[in-house]
């Protein structure tokens, strides 16, 4: 693995998991920045799932490769000639009855397989791994005004003992990221991890990604997503957002920033369940908004700090108004919400 960060000729990057929401927006930003881009998908024959990638090919040199996180040997061709590897994909199965088998072990093995492939590459200079705020903010601390930064890790022992709603996902993100750091240090891989809050804003996908469905649940009224958002605050202590375009820009920014190192929280806005409902009622009066919640959700316990990222020179472009304006527009365009 090449440790220098100087460019030679055309810049080239690989985005793992191109069918995802963040991955597709990241690919768009890379192409618009002059990169040649390779992306991996599990099934390149599924035209519905890669339709947005076909459209993105109009922006520049985008090649689609078949690869699977469970198969170490499937990444070699997609990594060829790439300076940066963006490991955005993660196994998600919230309906699983065996999260260890379906999420935790595949996430860990996927990280190892990707990093092993990077070691074999002669071109890879830096790996950017997408972690999650779920790897930082979940604990049994009490009180309010808690500030979480990159030094904090989610309490896996607490999650294992209590097994709260969707407990497998945060454990998978913690253990996968820690595995990435251990492997990178042992093998001298230049690794940066990005820790995003709940991803909001627009989408290039034909079906709404789960993060947008959660964010819009007080308007759609979908019980599963309403429960998910409320449980997120109970577990994490707040609801924190980042716009998908800001998050994609942060990935590219940290790839190219020579001084970047370690973990970076990427969060633009910290709030709570009732505050979201109040905001939606005021800004979008033509929609029915769920606004009755149990006690204990009114005050956010903690905030996620992006100060380290800001200190590197990054600036967020989108606030909560723009995030929700774009989600409203997206859901309206899909016929998923109706006015009163």
Curated annotation (Swiss-Prot):
The keyword Transport does not apply. It catalyses: a (2R,3R)-flavan-3-ol + 2 NAD(+) = an anthocyanidin with a 3-hydroxy group + 2 NADH + 2 H(+); a (2R,3R)-flavan-3-ol + 2 NADP(+) = an anthocyanidin with a 3-hydroxy group + 2 NADPH + 2 H(+). It is an enzyme of class 1 (oxidoreductase). Gene3D superfamilies: NAD(P)-binding Rossmann-like Domain. Flowers and young siliques. Detected specifically in the endothelium of seed coat. Optimum temperature is 55 degrees Celsius. Optimum pH is 8.0. NADP(+) binds at residues 49, 169. GO terms for biological process: flavonoid biosynthetic process; negative regulation of flavonoid biosynthetic process. The keyword Ribosomal protein does not apply. Belongs to the NAD(P)-dependent epimerase/dehydratase family. Dihydroflavonol-4-reductase subfamily. Involved in the biosynthesis of condensed tannins. Converts cyanidin into (-)-epicatechin as the major product. Homo- or heterodimer. This is Anthocyanidin reductase. It comes from Arabidopsis thaliana (Mouse-ear cress). The lineage of its organism: Eukaryota, Viridiplantae, Streptophyta, Embryophyta, Tracheophyta.
């Amino acid at each position: 693995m090449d440790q220098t960060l100087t460019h030679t000729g055309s810049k080239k990057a690989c985005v793992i998991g191109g069918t995802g929401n963040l991955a597709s927006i990241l690919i768009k930003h890379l192409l618009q920045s002059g990169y040649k881009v390779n992306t991996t998908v599990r099934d390149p024959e599924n035209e519905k799932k890669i339709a947005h990638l076909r459209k993105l090919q109009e922006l520049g040199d985008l090649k689609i490769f078949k690869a699977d996180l469970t198969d170490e040997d499937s990444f070699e061709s997609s990594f060829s000639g790439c300076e940066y590897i963006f490991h955005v994909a993660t196994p998600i199965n919230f309906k699983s009855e065996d999260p260890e088998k379906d999420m935790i072990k595949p996430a860990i093995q996927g990280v190892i397989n990707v990093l092993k492939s990077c070691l074999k590459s002669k071109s890879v200079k830096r790996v950017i791994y997408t972690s999650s705020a779920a790897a930082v903010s979940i604990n049994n601390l009490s009180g309010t005004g808690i500030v979480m930064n990159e030094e904090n890790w989610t309490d896996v022992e607490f999650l294992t003992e209590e097994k709260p709603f969707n407990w497998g996902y945060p454990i998978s993100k913690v253990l996968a990221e820690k595995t990435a750091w251990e492997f990178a240090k042992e093998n001298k891989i230049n690794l940066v991890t990005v820790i995003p809050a709940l991803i909001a804003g627009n989408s290039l996908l034909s079906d709404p990604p789960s993060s947008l469905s959660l964010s819009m649940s007080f308007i759609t009224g979908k019980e599963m997503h309403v429960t998910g958002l409320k449980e997120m605050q109970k577990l994490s202590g707040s609801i924190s957002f980042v716009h998908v375009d800001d998050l994609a820009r942060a990935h590219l920014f940290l790839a190219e920033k020579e001084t970047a190192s370690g973990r970076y929280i990427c969060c633009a806005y910290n709030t709570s369940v009732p505050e979201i409902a109040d905001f939606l009622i005021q800004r979008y009066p033509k929609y029915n908004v769920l606004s009755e919640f149990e006690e204990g959700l009114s005050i956010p316990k903690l905030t996620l700090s992006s100060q380290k990222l800001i200190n590197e020179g990054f600036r967020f472009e989108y606030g909560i108004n723009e995030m929700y304006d774009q989600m409203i527009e997206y859901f309206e365009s899909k016929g998923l919400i109706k006015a009163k």
